[in-house]
Amino acid sequence: MPVITDLIRTEADGSISFGNYELKAKTKKSDFEFEGDLYKIKTFNELTRLEKNELFLYESEPGTAVTHMKETAEGMSFTAWGPEDAQITIQCEPETDYDILIDGEIRDVQKSNLGGKLSFSVKLGDGSAKVQVLKHEAGQQA
């Protein structure tokens, strides 16, 4: 399973990867620039947290590694890796319905809270899960 030993990096496909769930002590890296934005990562075995321009973007408990995270106007996609199941919280638009797809299947349609946070769990079990969180279109069946 991949861990990001340098804590955060850019990928050739225009995405970012971050997190190292193997670390026993909390480790941080600040001021990582990507596409004009500044990122800050805090990661270790109990937690992985990513901030973009000093605002919350991603958090998992326990810690995870995330590969190929991309943000679009429709939502976000990434692959989460970890030694056990994880609770993930991401920043979205406030009070908006989102489809949560895990490994290509719609798991849930969920509304982000007033602050825009959306939480869900992923079954990793010493593996990975491909996650897509996309704005739910009105009239679409879940």
Feature map (PLM): residue ranges:
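A generic structural signal for short, non-catalytic loop/turn and secondary-structure boundary residues
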Residues: 9-11, 16, 71, 81, ...
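Short strand-turn-strand beta-turns centered on an Asx-Gly dipeptide
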Residues: 101-105
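Catalytic cores of secreted or luminal carbohydrate-active enzymes
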Residues: 2-65
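C-terminal beta-strand-rich structural cap/linker in extracellular carbohydrate-active enzymes
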Residues: 28-51, 60, 86-88, 112-142
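A short tyrosine-centered beta-strand micro-motif
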Residues: 97-100, 129
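Beta-strand-rich interaction surfaces with strong enrichment in secreted/lumenal proteins
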Residues: 65-68, 75-78, 108-110, 119-123
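Surface-exposed beta-strand/loop patches in extracellular or lumenal glycoproteins
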Residues: 79-96
